[in-house]
Amino acid sequence: MATKRKIKDDVLFRKNKILAYERSGGMCELCRCRPAQEVHHIVYRSHLGTSILSNLACLCLQCHNEAHGVNAKEIRKHLLDVVGVEQS
């Protein structure tokens, strides 16, 4: 059974993924070369990241795979800069 936190975050995600696509202009926010096809949580939900707009990045399939790969930490830092979020 889903927790209240997850249900609330799912509702927020549905709303903010549209805003994230608008912000990106439909392009991948990492490579800026290909159309965005997926919305990525910069701070993973499994690490208690939420679906606030500043934690979402629109990525193409290739960049989304890279964002979960061996360079995930560096990509995360770059995406935080791209979407205009200061790191704590």
Question: Where in the sequence are the language-model features?
Answer:
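Zinc-coordinating Cys/His ligand positions in small cysteine/histidine-rich zinc-finger domains
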Residues: 60-63
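Histidine-centered nuclease catalytic patch
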Residues: 29-58, 69-73
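A contiguous, mid-protein "functional segment" used to position or interact
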Residues: 66
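A boundary/linker detector
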Residues: 1-36, 73-88
